[in-house]
């Protein structure tokens, strides 16, 4: 490896050739502020446009941006000269002069990178006055709010949308003072190819991109006495919510989270993991049927709503490959309202209000899909995110970190370890393989850990020997990688039998409205490890071993993929390509 030797603040350091001054400074634990820069090399996410100029440092007699200047042999860098510090201050002051001064009521207050840098630089007044740019706020979707008055043109969202997700909704428009990152022709997000994956939100350093706030609606539901309000919680939430209360990323906070939800006033606190186990029952059966018939392969998983939006808009002619299974959120809601409510609690489905807590803003949109319900009663009434739940807990004055742990309620609170790993890339496929293997072979699977489908590579593939039969599998993370694999499928080059797709890099643990990771991918890794730790700790690690699931089939669903199971647990998809004027319903079993 070719190394470059340089000095930063009189400290010597050696870095690989091609490294930047910022890379070298990090090796010395010297902090240089950045706004536009984002480098999550583990998942190939890099935004290095050097546009904000907040990272200016002194080299010789001049100033250069640390994030975009390569380290050179013998270079002498000073990060804390008067010239460098004043340059940073001026840049931040200019940004603030064209920025709304509403920090106290901004959704990003306390997590805003611009706010943090301004505080660290000791900026206490806005010296520059003048005309402010204006952009309308887009509230057209049920998931994302676009408030570009707060945009600082860092281009992170543009990189994420175009380079990583290949959706291509956001781009720079206009010139000079009128420059902004926007949709084509200032089109509302609801009328674009946006999949609502929320990754633009996860990397936005300010409050320019946020989620639709559903907290008031949940409070209203909790404070009225007309309906029984129940809540379900996704697996990724339990290993991330602790971050909002000072706990380390990946801390397993399941029991404390349940206690907090009960303190908020939810009548019953259930686990989306029950829905995940149920999803595996249906999806494994569906896969086995298709595999034996060699029909509609490869089967594409359907748990991720952003992925479903993506394939509906980009590959509608291949929707026949998509599993008809609802997501765990949808399956849970359907069972809660059509089994739990009438048969266990003796109440009408319309009198149950189901709230979901998800790591994902696309789940808000998923709840609103008309096909996800029965008789105009939605499976899930409303979805909030991990951060929204944290806000509700704080509003109620609850100290989550010091709560005594409480268990989920029965019967929809029981789950296996297979359900927990749904929250990380490869988890859905691994859970499906655990069940499919035993159903195909009628033999016990001794080692349930499928390490070949684990890890954070964007595309992982493996050939699994199922008692002499080879099953070729693929795990895909990010929509850009999904596009690559779909193009292989279309060209006939694909050898896969089953493909798992998650829109977020690393899976749901990196969802668009989890606690902000600020570009630190180690946080996402710790969350994923937390889920694997939960799986390892459970006695039952195969979905078909869940006693409550077995009871549900015996009492209500009959068997996987039965007629009644299809009625409540399966769905259909639509051609949403802009090429077509009318939505066309497409299902995989027609």
Enumerate the predicted regions with their spans.
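Cysteine-centered loop/knuckle micro-motif
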Residues: 161, 204, 253
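Structural motif corresponding to the C-terminal cap of alpha-helices
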Residues: 165, 204, 340-344
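Iron-sulfur-associated redox domains of electron-transfer enzymes in respiratory
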Residues: 5, 18-74, 80-84, 88, ...
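Helix-enriched interaction subdomains in cytosolic or periplasmic regions
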Residues: 188-210, 312-316, 328, 383
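Eukaryote-biased recognition of intrinsically disordered, low-complexity regulatory segments
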Residues: 1-11
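Fe-S ferredoxin-like electron-transfer domains
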Residues: 53-196, 209-221, 228
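Short, contiguous acidic and Ser/Thr-rich linear segments
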Residues: 11-19
């Amino acid at each position: 490896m070719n190394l470059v030797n340089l000095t930063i603040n009189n400290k010597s350091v050696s870095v690989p050739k091609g490294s930047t001054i910022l890379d070298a400074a990090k090796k010395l634990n010297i902090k240089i502020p950045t706004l536009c820069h984002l480098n999550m090399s583990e998942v190939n996410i890099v935004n290095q446009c050097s546009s904000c100029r907040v990272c200016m440092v002194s080299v010789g007699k001049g100033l250069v941006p640390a994030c975009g200047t390569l380290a050179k042999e013998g270079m002498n860098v000073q990060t804390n000269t008067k010239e460098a510090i004043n340059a940073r201050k001026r840049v931040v002051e200019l940004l603030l002069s064209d920025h709304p001064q509403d920090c106290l009521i901004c959704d990003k207050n306390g997590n805003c990178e611009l706010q943090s840098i301004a505080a660290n630089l000791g900026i206490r007044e806005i010296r520059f006055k003048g005309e402010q740019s204006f952009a309308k706020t887009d509230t057209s979707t049920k998931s994302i709010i676009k408030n570009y008055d707060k945009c600082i043109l860092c281009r992170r969202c543009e990189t994420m949308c175009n380079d990583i997700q290949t959706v291509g909704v956001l781009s720079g428009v206009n010139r000079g003072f009128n420059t902004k990152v926007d949709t084509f022709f200032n089109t509302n997000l609801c009328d674009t190819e946006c999949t609502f994956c929320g990754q633009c939100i996860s990397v936005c350093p300010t409050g320019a991109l946020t989620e639709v706030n559903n907290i008031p609606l949940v409070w209203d539901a909790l404070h009225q006495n007309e309906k029984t309000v129940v809540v379900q919680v996704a697996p990724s939430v339990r290993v991330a919510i602790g971050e909002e209360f000072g706990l380390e990323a990946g801390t397993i906070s399941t029991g404390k989270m349940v206690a907090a939800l009960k303190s908020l006033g939810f009548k019953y606190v259930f686990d989306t993991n029950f829905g995940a186990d149920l999803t595996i029952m249906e999806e494994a059966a569906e896969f086995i049927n298709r595999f034996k018939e060699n029909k509609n392969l490869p089967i594409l998983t359907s748990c991720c709503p952003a992925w479903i939006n993506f394939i509906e808009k980009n590959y509608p002619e291949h929707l026949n490959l998509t599993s008809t299974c609802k997501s765990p959120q949808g399956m849970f809601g359907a069972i809660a309202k059509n089994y739990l409510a009438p048969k266990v609690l003796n109440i009408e489905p319309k009198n149950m209000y189901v709230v979901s807590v998800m790591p994902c803003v696309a789940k808000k949109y998923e709840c609103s899909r008309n096909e996800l319900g029965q008789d105009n009663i939605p499976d899930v009434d409303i979805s909030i995110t991990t951060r929204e739940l944290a806000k509700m807990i704080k509003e109620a004055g609850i100290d989550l970190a010091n709560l005594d742990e409480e268990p989920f309620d029965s019967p929809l609170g029981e789950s296996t370890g297979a359900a927990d790993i749904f929250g990380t890339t490869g988890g859905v496929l691994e859970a499906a393989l655990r069940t499919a293997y035993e159903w195909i072979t009628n033999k016990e699977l001794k080692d349930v850990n499928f390490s070949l489908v684990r890890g954070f590579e964007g595309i992982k593939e493996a050939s699994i020997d199922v008692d002499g039969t080879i099953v070729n599998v693929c795990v895909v993370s990010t929509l850009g990688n999904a596009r690559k694999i779909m193009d292989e499928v279309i060209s006939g080059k694909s050898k896969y039998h089953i493909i798992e797709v998650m829109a977020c890099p690393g899976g749901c643990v990196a969802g668009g409205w989890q606690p902000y990771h600020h570009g630190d991918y180690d946080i996402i890794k710790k969350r994923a490890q937390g889920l694997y730790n939960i799986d390892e700790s459970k006695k039952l690690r195969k979905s078909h071993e869940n006693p409550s699931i077995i009871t549900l089939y015996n009492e209500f669903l009959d068997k996987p993929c039965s007629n009644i199971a299809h009625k409540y647990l399966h769905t259909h998809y639509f051609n949403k390509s802009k090429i077509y004027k009318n939505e066309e319903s497409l299902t995989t079993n027609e």
